From Swiss-Prot:
CDD domains according to UniProt: GrpE
Taxonomic lineage of the native organism: Eukaryota, Amoebozoa, Evosea, Eumycetozoa, Dictyostelia
This protein's name: GrpE protein homolog, mitochondrial
GO terms assigned for molecular function: adenyl-nucleotide exchange factor activity; protein homodimerization activity; protein-folding chaperone binding; unfolded protein binding
Gene3D superfamilies: 3.90.20.20, Head domain of nucleotide exchange factor GrpE
Length: 213
């Protein structure tokens, strides 16, 4: 009985023993598997690794973008400065010429006063004190208006005898006076006005045009 049991144990041990050749095969398979995994990982690492020269190209591109950004900032700053300057000029013009429409209305009053002073017969002013006082009162009123408007930059000009200038003169008729130069202002109907060198109203004039004999 005991001998039978021993034989069975020996038989079991013999059947479960791992042969050396099988162990070596398993170890080789494990080595090959690890090697294959490492080799498989190499292509991925190569793909993630930057190509030669790509870093320099990226730096150069960033420099170009930085320069472009600087230019845009300079352009923006220049535009803002221009807007600020134009706004300042517009404000100054508004202050200087804001009364232009108002002065045009006052010109009619001054024209009437000027016309009134010219209606007084000069030869009788010294003979008639009341007439002379009235003339002086009208003249003083005219001068007061001119002074007030002058304080605001409005100036009157009389172009008699000057060369005709279509920028400042408006011809309403022609003269033929051989004693005066051709194409000059021979008569002034209404004097002209400027506001800070800007023409408010041209002078209404008669131009001398000498006709050939």
């Amino acid at each position: 009985m005991n001998s039978l049991i021993r034989r069975g144990l020996v038989s079991i041990r013999t059947s479960t023993v791992i042969k050396p050749s099988s162990f070596g095969l398993m170890r080789n398979n494990r080595f090959y598997s690890t090697e294959n995994n490492q080799e498989a990982a190499k292509p991925e690492e190569t793909e993630n690794k930057p190509a030669p020269g790509s870093l320099e190209e990226t730096i150069e591109k960033l420099k170009e973008e930085l320069e472009e950004t600087k230019k845009q900032l300079l352009y923006t700053a220049a535009d803002r400065e221009n807007v600020r300057r134009f706004a300042k000029e517009d404000n100054e013009k508004a202050k200087k010429f804001g009364i232009q429409s108002f002065t045009k209305e006052l010109l009619e009053v001054v024209d009437q006063l000027e016309m009134a002073t010219n209606l007084f017969p000069k030869e009788k002013l010294d003979e008639n004190k009341e007439l002379k006082d009235l003339h002086e009162g009208v003249k003083m009123t005219e001068q007061l208006f001119l002074k007030i408007m002058g304080n605001q930059g409005l100036q009157r000009f009389n172009p008699i005898g000057e060369k005709f200038d279509f920028n400042n003169h408006h011809a309403i008729f022609e003269l033929n006076d051989p004693t005066k130069e051709n194409n000059t202002v021979g008569h002034v109907v209404k004097q002209g006005y400027k506001l800070h060198d800007r023409l408010v109203r041209p002078a209404m004039v008669g131009v001398n045009k000498i006709k050939p004999q």
